[in-house]
């Protein structure tokens, strides 16, 4: 099927989804969860093909981890779908309402956006996250995953479409672009007759390409250097636990720690403790010149190059730099592509407020790990993306962020004077 015909089918499906009840949506979501469980062996077999192809292509272990599905991860995906069922449906909810002097009852009511195009790399769970959230909000979706997860995504979409059809909904509500030709990405970005929003999920190059070539509004997000600043007053032992979690729990995640900024006054006592911990966790340290001498005990240490503090590591590598105070930490963050998730570890309330007000990130934390920037952690269910732009949506994009609104006026045969 051509992209044009896919767009037409998605638009027709979106019209139908916009009118169905929450109960119908939840019925279809339950069918998707059941079908994922029933066809788990086929899904895992498809994923095995992707992992084998990835190893043959020489992908890193961090990237292979992003691709991997196993029984536990698949069970987590199913649980996420069932979680979406329990969430409130924002469609139809009134944002606000007032009665004008002429008697017109005027309200803003949430509505689906329409057709969402999503271009993403790796992580096959994204396919289910997007489909389930779009379905709950009455949006159709057109998906283009990375070639690294081609077989996994194809099988997952087959499962979704079978469940939709069994629930009496159009299978075209979730469609997958299965042609690997990169030219189709450009064609999707210009399909503004049918597609209402583009969400790229991937690296800076993908976001730049979408922003420069799309005739459709683009949500920019997912990419950004995550920082943690250890202030002079921070509790060193508890800070190490937060740093370990932010860096090591899932280093391939976009909210994992990339750069650690340490106050100069505590560096001599704090960094040797950090080195021991990072050695245990086999983390490579990439240090600014002002930190090198204090990291001499590191098993894997190199001096930072010109672009290292602009690098989203997505693996067991950590940038380190010493700063004089919270203001210098914020200046470094502004210069080096902060915008996703950043944190300060401190017992100084004034510095905490200065950091929160000065950081331009979508999510800012005081004494907490950057790993919390996630739809599930925020209680939003799954997410379609983490937006790092100012307009429309910011941070994890859950159900509400996949809606727009319309004005609704109710009256008793009122005419305009």
Swiss-Prot record:
It catalyses: L-glutamate 5-semialdehyde + phosphate + NADP(+) = L-glutamyl 5-phosphate + NADPH + H(+). It comes from the Bacteria. It holds the Pfam family Aldedh. Its main location: cytoplasm. Its EC number is 1.2.1.41. It is an enzyme of class 1 (oxidoreductase). Pathway: Amino-acid biosynthesis; L-proline biosynthesis; L-glutamate 5-semialdehyde from L-glutamate: step 2/2. InterPro entries: Ald_DH/histidinol_DH (IPR016161), Ald_DH_C (IPR016163), Ald_DH_N (IPR016162), Aldehyde_DH_dom (IPR015590), G-glutamylP_reductase_CS (IPR020593), Glu-5-SA_DH (IPR012134), GPR_dom (IPR000965). GO terms for biological process: L-proline biosynthetic process. It is found in: Cytoplasm. Transmembrane segments: none annotated. Keywords: Amino-acid biosynthesis, Cytoplasm, NADP, Oxidoreductase, Proline biosynthesis. One of its GO terms (molecular function) is NADP binding. PROSITE patterns: PROA. One of its GO terms (cellular component) is cytoplasm. Belongs to the gamma-glutamyl phosphate reductase family. Catalyzes the NADPH-dependent reduction of L-glutamate 5-phosphate into L-glutamate 5-semialdehyde and phosphate. The product spontaneously undergoes cyclization to form 1-pyrroline-5-carboxylate. This is Gamma-glutamyl phosphate reductase. It comes from Aeromonas salmonicida (strain A449).
